[in-house]
Amino acid sequence: YGSTMRAVLEKVRPNSMSQMNAVQLYRPSVAQRQKEMLNLSLQKLEEASLSAQSSTKEEASLRMQEAQLISRFVAKARTVVPKGEVILNESNIDSVLLEDGDVINIPEKTSLVMVHGEVLFPNAVSWQKGMTTEDYIEKCGGLTQKSGNARIIVIRQNGAAVNAEDVDSLKPGDEIMVLPKYESK
């Protein structure tokens, strides 16, 4: 407690399978704040669905059904327990002060890239230098019909999430997440 991340990592004796450039930090105080922000967002979503105006009887009926669906979603979402992950930047790891209760995880090296979301067969694919995001998606059967012009995100092993369009090259341990396209009324 009060020590820096760098000081702690210097005391660690990694083995050959330790992925030291993807260190993960989980912090209870961050998890608590994430939960507060999630609850606030859910409250606003619920309020917006319940206060939506309708001009016809049919529209009012649709809005009521929509509000019920949103209320069920909100009830489920309230049970989510945030991890409290802090995404670390290698360049300023010296300035990260540790707090009581922090958990440091050093992931194992892997030779896989996970692909999930709106793909036909979500799967793990062996990493190959030069393969693109699209190549990995094709190895999983391609996009589903629901994907439309879906947003694709790459989640790095250290927890950082990056728009796939901004990724020059994929690394072992990356995850490709194809988010579904949401159709609004």
Positions of PLM-derived features:
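Ser/Thr/Pro/Gly-biased, low-complexity, turn-/loop-rich segments
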Residues: 1-185
